[in-house]
A protein has these predicted regions:
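Interface amphipathic segments
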Residues: 1-389
Length: 389
């Protein structure tokens, strides 16, 4: 027995009852609903063409308005919706369960950005706070372990707060810790009505590697996002690039600031012991500043080894057009070419020697015009197919 028009509010009252400060909607008494049905993809596909749900998907539950009771279970072998595929999904929620309120498990979750396997999430309510515990594996090889503890609550101003307790994850063979000192600073405070977000200091630590992030967003008018890196290894976060292995230790800052219509993105970074394909190039310094835009930047880059600059480049990068444009002046002094030999693959190899000179790079970023002169010293290369060296 239930009023169809009041069913959403009855369900919301049952879920909201776990919060002590929840103000329920007024609904008619003695409303309840028991349901148990099987979902057929043919029906779903008519209304949502981009959604696939396995025909063996079952949904079962119970709602009781007078008892503020809400129970729901969902089991599905496979759901594919909007580019995300979930296999062996099991979802349980019971707002009267004293051990946990929600349980979610899945064998696999595939997205365009990252794949997850063996997902297990539990949720429980305590006073006005929802606590979550989530364990899963990530990555294509399923060798990246995540152990996350986080919470959701409201502060004294009525704003939502999403925060992390001490958590850890393994990414690219590095064990990272979130909120390692348990100071309760790693959290996001937000208000969806005003579209305001405040990021308290987020801290990621892995040995000597440290990443700190703070910021705030106020609608579309103000953005302040600040990231600091301390001794972060490039190989701990960079994806694999064919024939190009980059190593080094990153330190510096990356800032994005937008206030009163003025854009001021800026980066000041240093990569110590910068290596390309296991050849040490020295220390790389990179300074980038937005020209009142987040699409056009002035750039200054150089590599220094033993107080000598082997390469320096300065100019502008413009991403405002459909095809990005570059305008750079480049200087080389005894720049070693050996590191780029793997780029030739089977066509050419044994690239060697040094290059010195000046030239410009102007035009489309993907294929710029080069103008200048280079002097090669002790240079050479090999064409394996022709047996010419």
């Amino acid at each position: 027995k239930f009023s169809f028009s009041e069913l959403p509010r009855v369900a919301q009252n049952a879920l909201g009852s776990i919060y002590t400060n929840y103000k329920p909607y007024k609904v008619e008494p003695k409303q309840y609903l028991d349901f148990n049905f099987t979902v057929y993809n043919q029906i779903i596909n008519v209304f949502f063409p981009k959604v696939f749900i396995d025909d063996k998907t079952k949904i079962k539950g119970k709602i009781n308005a007078d008892k503020d009771l809400f129970r729901l279970s969902l089991n599905s072998p496979r759901i594919d919706a909007f580019g995300t595929e979930v296999k062996a999904l099991s979802f349980r929620t019971d707002n009267k369960n004293k051990l946990y309120n929600t349980s979610l498990t899945a064998d696999e979750v595939k997205t365009a950005y990252y794949n997850i396997s063996k997902l297990n999430l539990l949720n429980r309510a305590e006073n006005d706070t929802l606590y979550f515990k989530s364990i899963f594996k990530g990555g294509n090889k399923k060798n990246e372990d995540f152990n996350l503890d986080f919470f959701y609550t409201f502060n004294s101003d009525g704003k939502s707060v999403l925060g992390f307790e001490k958590s850890s994850f393994i990414f690219k063979e590095n064990n990272w810790n979130i909120n390692p000192d348990m100071k309760n600073t790693d959290k996001i405070t937000f208000d969806l009505k005003t579209n305001e977000f405040n990021f308290s200091q987020f801290k990621l630590i892995s040995g000597e590697q440290k990443i700190k992030f703070i910021g705030n967003l106020k609608g579309t008018e103000e953005k302040v996002l600040l990231v600091d890196f301390t001794k972060v290894k490039l190989q701990s976060f960079l994806p694999k690039i064919d024939s190009l292995a980059l190593k080094g230790v990153l330190s510096g800052s990356l800032d994005f600031v937008q206030k009163e219509g003025v854009y001021a993105p800026e980066a000041s970074l240093k990569i110590a012991n910068f290596e390309v394909n296991n050849f040490n190039q020295g220390d790389l310094f990179l300074n980038i500043k937005g020209e009142n835009s987040y699409k056009k930047y002035s750039t200054d880059l150089f590599i220094e080894s033993k107080d000598v600059k082997s390469i320096a480049a300065s100019g502008t990068l413009d991403f405002s057009a459909e095809r990005p444009i570059m305008d750079l002046e480049v200087f080389l002094e005894d720049f070693k070419l050996n590191a780029f030999s793997p780029l030739g693959k089977n066509v050419l190899s044994s690239l060697r020697g040094t290059a010195s000179g000046n030239f410009t790079l102007r035009g489309f970023l993907s294929n710029p015009d080069m103008d200048g002169a280079l002097r090669l010293n002790n240079a050479g290369l090999k064409f394996p197919y022709l047996n010419i060296n």
